Amino acid sequence: MNVNEIIKGPILTEKSYQLMSSGVYSFKVSPKTNRSETKKAVEYIFNVKVEKVNIFTVPKKEKKLGKSKGFTTKYKKALVKLMPGYTINLFEDESPQDQKDSETVSENTEEKAKIAKKKAELEAKNKEIAEKLAKKQAELAKKESETNENQEKKIENQTENQENSAK
């Protein structure tokens, strides 16, 4: 039997996750296979050393959906115990994604820090500009008041001169 045809796929249940921590992995295998073929297939596909293989057939079970009754298909299940120090990464697609996620999280925190720093710098510049504007406005207001006073004095002087010349 071809090595790729022996293992149909992993069985991922709550119990199988608990067994994975102790180095036991569960697979759905071809009904025609035996222990030695399963051992060779796991060692070849996952590049690990297998200590022990247990195989058993899971019988069909009756299922009801509404009024209709049916059966699940029976299948062969293999529990494969690996030698100490070996593991199988069943989630190869997710591990690089997890690394990417952690990298993006660290990049996001760095970007947030940069943004916060730029924001603080901009706020400081805005404060300086606001102070300069306030000073200039105060100077302009002072000059305006001085020019208004000077104009008032000129007008008073002109009116006094006109009054004096009229007398």
UniProtKB/Swiss-Prot annotation:
Region annotation Large ribosomal subunit protein uL23: where it falls in the sequence? 1-118
- Which GO terms fall under biological process for this protein? translation
| Molecular function via GO | rRNA binding; structural constituent of ribosome
Q: Where is this region: Unknown?
A: 119-167
Where is the sequence biased in composition, kind Polar residues?
158-167
- UniProt lists compositionally biased (Basic and acidic residues) regions at 97-112, 137-157
HAMAP family reported in the protein's UniProt record: Ribosomal_uL23_B
Record's subunit section: Part of the 50S ribosomal subunit. Contacts protein L29, and trigger factor when it is bound to the ribosome.
Q: What is this protein called?
A: Large ribosomal subunit protein uL23
* Organism for this UniProt entry: Mesomycoplasma hyopneumoniae (strain 232) (Mycoplasma hyopneumoniae)
Q: Gene encoding this polypeptide?
A: rplW
